[in-house]
Design a protein with these regions (language model features):
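A generic structural signal for alpha-helix starts
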Residues: 55, 151-153, 218-219
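Mobile acidic interaction elements
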Residues: 128, 215-217, 230
Length: 233
């Protein structure tokens, strides 16, 4: 995206422009529920609303870092097919993206960069080389991560802490046993930024692995609305 061209749209009447994608040259990147209070209306003219996966991961990682001190880690996304993908093989600048949408594809993702833009204290801790599994489903994504944390904790205490610290508007915890575990379609039109699967949360000494469910379209749109309503006041 050419930010210089976007800035040409600014005028006396149009004082701020919000972009629904990651844009490193934007004046400010916001994930609602993480850093919207740092927005300065007269200074931040071009505002990026990050990405759907950034909005899913950042609120959770903010709490984990504040409570348990993230040392380093990796993030991976499991993401449905995009509209740009075709049902049959065809040309594409990335060969794997040119393959039919019924395939499982491994591609690079900017989720780590999106997180670091709003949580700069995680720079150098979350690996920038993140990967995405593009899978042949229509809706609902998952963020999988492995983190090394400084403060050791049991799984039960970790879940209790996350549940206590989270804002229920942005985050949720899916409790239950193996027999009650939910699947992706159960989260369609769930407005929360992400929902932690307690059953799929594991802790081994100082290593934490987790799964976050999120409706990558509906929940992201709700956060876009929240952010614009808050920042345009």
């Amino acid at each position: 995206m050419n930010i210089k061209n976007v800035k040409k749209l600014l005028s006396k009447k149009l004082k701020n422009i919000f972009i629904t994608r990651s844009a490193k040259e934007a004046d400010f990147t916001v994930v609602y529920g993480v850093n919207e209070k740092k927005f300065i209306k007269n200074k931040h003219k071009i505002v990026s609303l990050s990405t759907c996966t950034g909005n899913a991961a950042a609120p959770f990682l903010k709490i984990v870092n504040e409570e348990f001190n993230i040392q380093n880690g990796f993030l991976t996304t499991i993401h449905p097919v995009l509209s740009s993908e075709k049902s049959l093989d065809g040309p594409n600048r990335l060969p794997q993206l040119g393959r039919a949408s019924k395939n499982v594809k491994l591609i690079d993702t900017a989720i780590s960069k999106s997180v670091i833009e709003v949580l700069p204290n995680l720079s150098g801790k979350i690996a920038l080389e993140a990967m995405s599994y593009r899978i042949p489903t229509d809706i609902v994504s998952s963020v999988y991560g492995v983190l090394k944390i400084k403060k050791k904790v049991t799984k039960d205490d970790f879940i209790k802490t996350i549940s206590k610290k989270m804002n229920p508007k942005f985050l949720g915890v899916c409790y239950g046993s193996f027999k009650k575990e939910r699947v992706s379609l159960d989260y369609i039109k769930d407005s929360r930024s992400s929902i932690l699967s307690s059953f799929r949360t594991s802790i081994n000494d100082d290593l934490l692995s987790f799964h976050l469910w999120h409706d990558n379209e509906y929940a992201y749109c709700r956060r876009i609305y929240d952010a614009i309503m808050q920042l345009s006041r």
